[in-house]
């Protein structure tokens, strides 16, 4: 039986489930027991990549493969999916175990992004690909239209490196602060240090690479604010 809170949430995401248990599974983190959302996350990752690839292919008829790939990566990266989750207030709906609740798991990018993918898979399984496309693509519309046609924004590490190289300054140094979690729920915190600028930022993510991107993004924000 689905709760009234989850029932209301279906209206927010724009889809009412025939099988509400799929939504409940999509919202249940592995820390809260089974059935949890990891299998749905696996499927949802492929579905969202297909939907975004298809949308970009149709909207950018002159873009080459490289531009399309970079654009898709920008739209489906962890921070982008987590932003969608926050817009939909998905964190408030997550079913988490006591440990994740205590540590603020409902605010963590990796958990939010995984849940978005799981919800997408749940919609796909409950209906079909066409319905999933109709429901899900509007979630990405703002980000899709914001991308410069054929020239998606480079990732934060590349942008930061190019900014420093243009000024002939040393490249940033990334260091692992800590990692936690089991192999399926790893969490990383990384620092980014700019020696000449005496600037140090930190970032988090479900992989070291994502944590470094997050730290670089924070460094760019700091540099922009100091202009």
From Swiss-Prot:
Database matches in PROSITE patterns: DS_RBD, RNASE_3_1, RNASE_3_2
InterPro entries: dsRBD_dom (IPR014720), RNase_III (IPR011907), RNase_III_dom (IPR000999), RNase_III_sf (IPR036389)
Disulfide bonds: none
This protein's record includes keyword Magnesium: yes
Known EC number: 3.1.26.3
DRBM domain sequence ranges: 155-225
Record-annotated active site: 45, 117
A GO MF term: metal ion binding
Residue spans of biased composition, Basic and acidic residues class: 203-212
Region spans: Disordered: 203-227
GO CC terms in record: cytoplasm
Subcellular location: Cytoplasm
SMART domains per the UniProt record, alphabetical: DSRM (SM00358), RIBOc (SM00535)
GO biological processes: mRNA processing; regulation of gene expression; rRNA processing; tRNA processing
Keyword annotations: Cytoplasm, Endonuclease, Hydrolase, Magnesium, Metal-binding, mRNA processing, Nuclease, RNA-binding, rRNA processing, rRNA-binding, tRNA processing
Positions that bind Mg(2+): 41, 114, 117
All residue ranges annotated as the RNase III domain in the record: 6-128
Keyword Metal-binding tagged: yes
Catalysed reactions listed for this entry: Endonucleolytic cleavage to 5'-phosphomonoester
Family listed: Belongs to the ribonuclease III family.
Assembly behavior: Homodimer.
Function, as annotated: Digests double-stranded RNA. Involved in the processing of primary rRNA transcript to yield the immediate precursors to the large and small rRNAs (23S and 16S). Processes some mRNAs, and tRNAs when they are encoded in the rRNA operon. Processes pre-crRNA and tracrRNA of type II CRISPR loci if present in the organism.
Protein name: Ribonuclease 3
